[in-house]
Regions:
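A short His-aromatic
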Residues: 18, 73-74
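A short beta-strand submotif of the Rossmann-like class I SAM-dependent methyltransferase core
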Residues: 68-71
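Core SAM-dependent methyltransferase catalytic element
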Residues: 155-172
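Class I SAM-dependent methyltransferase SAM/SAH-binding core
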Residues: 2, 12-57
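Class I SAM-dependent methyltransferase "Motif I" SAM/SAH-binding loop
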Residues: 5-9
Length: 172
């Protein structure tokens, strides 16, 4: 299992502890976060996980599952990254994407939590994406239509919402 954009590795460490017979690789381009993740794995005594400083288009593998947890909307070239992930999947592999909850239209997202997500997105997510190659600038309220377009453009034949909470949507 690859966890791309893992940051300090909380999601990767959680999965590795829950599934000791599986192997996990946390991937992030931020070196200090990867150092923290490796230290945490050592402290927890987890031998089925490792963390690597890599970009979202440079890691290598043949993965059954590639995860993107709350990070795809921050990436400058989400289509290129989704295409690359597809090239690293095993024969029956899947991508799991978790993104902030958003309704299908901007008008529906202005109140409540959607308004907060727009605020965070304006000051962090969108500038982060725009500073990278391609700079698509999707932001935290891209929603299902935005994410579906990324995976359609990347050549995936299937994209579906599999679960949701008030704060996140899970796609496969």
């Amino acid at each position: 299992v690859a966890d791309v954009g893992c940051g300090a590795g909380l999601s990767t460490l959680t999965m590795a502890a829950a599934f000791p017979d599986s192997t996990f690789v946390g991937i992030d381009f931020h070196g200090p976060s990867i150092e923290m993740a490796n230290a945490a794995a050592e402290e927890k005594g987890l031998s089925n996980v490792r963390f690597e400083v890599e970009s979202a288009t440079s890691y290598q593998g043949n993965y059954d599952l590639i995860c993107f947890f709350d990070c795809m909307h921050d990436m400058g070239d989400p289509v290129g990254i989704a295409q690359y992930a597809k090239s690293q999947l095993g024969e029956n592999g899947s991508v799991m994407l978790i993104e902030p909850f958003a309704f299908d239209s901007r008008q529906e997202n202005h109140a409540g939590l959607g308004g907060a997500f727009y605020g965070f997105s304006s000051f962090f997510c969108t500038p982060c994406s725009l500073s990278q190659d391609v700079g698509r600038g999707m932001g935290a309220q891209a929603g299902e239509p935005g994410m579906r377009s990324v995976f359609d453009e990347a050549g995936y034949g299937n994209f579906q919402r599999i679960s949701e909470t008030p704060t996140n949507i899970v796609y496969e």
